[in-house]
Amino acid sequence: MFENVLSKEAIEVADAISPFLKDFYLAGGTGLAIQLGHRVSMDLDFFSQTPFESETLLYKLSPDKIITAREGTIHCEQKGIKLSFLFYREPLAYPVILWKELSVADWKDITAEKFKAISQRGSKRDFYDLYAVLKMKITVEEACEIFRKRFNLSGINKYHVLKSLVFFEDAEVEPEPILHVKGRDWEWVSVKSYFEDNIKKFEKGLLL
């Protein structure tokens, strides 16, 4: 695991809260970054397939700041680290891995989620994350197969997902992520070009 993508405070928080998160798994950008090592990530996003009582979990966590708290959803801060705890019914397609007594979604499950995230909000970090998987791990065709395996029965509009892969307007105004990988291939213009140049492959892979 690439712990150098996290701050010292984030690692301390992860250690402190792990005893209370037996029903949760870490995913999102941080879950991916600690497996690929491609960028710095500041937030810790946890998901549970089991409904949970927000008040009970908050009592155990004792965060410094509560941002949102309702049934199945908590957003809070501890030592300046943003934490999210969400009830998310969608099952994982691959076994979780263990890191510091925490369950972490496999990078392949997070890859599928990155397609979905891009279709919903298209943040620059999400584009970079999916790009990192495609540069470092698998082909476009394999990534599309992973997405279908995870979400084929979920009712997600695959045409919308496809169009979102080349819609960069919202991402353009966001800051660049802090990367641990260097080179012209990792510049934002190269990331955009990759998706544009491979859109036919994505179309074939997503719309089978």
Label each PLM-derived region with a short phrase:
Residues 1-208:
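Compositionally biased terminal segments of proteins
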